[in-house]
Amino acid sequence: LNRDEIGDRAPSAVAVMPTAAIEQHGPHNPVGLDTMCCMAVARGAAEAAGEVDVIVSPPLHFGSSDHHRPFPGVLSLRSGTFSQVLYEVVESLALSGFRRILILNGHGGNILLIQQVARDFVLANPDARVAAAAYWDIARPRLEAVEAARPVNVPGHGGDFETALMLHLDSELVRSDLVPVKDADRDDPRT
């Protein structure tokens, strides 16, 4: 979209701002898994929104992942930096004319931070409607309906749920030969 298209649509559209992380998800999944899954869900939701105009913004790839820093490939922001960057992106969306903004989370470590940013922004901008949610929480009722949402596996971390999503999105990026075979290892963030 160009600036004029965004300007025309923003006042009546919902902006979806995907947030994620670049971090390890076991030896078998790519480090960009959180971003790829969150973007796919955001785009799918936008397509399925019917008459509701949904514009998906570019994602905030980098999350707060200090607990994964011992692993190679992790690109993490300190929680204060992440929150400040996200606040300013939400502010930019509002300045572009969006009145309704959903911060869509794709990384467990961001949950409390995105909720706080949404609260802080609404307190400072009472006319704004900003919500924050993880994609797996939004999808949980449908996942439970097909018995895919046991408490231990959604979203998990590099476990069955996330690996299945990656296999669906781009199976070439999943190293099937490196998938842990013991159930206990599948959702362990240390693997």
Predicted regions: what is each one?
Residues 1-102, 108-191:
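Extended, histidine- and acidic-residue-enriched regions that form the cofactor-binding/catalytic faces
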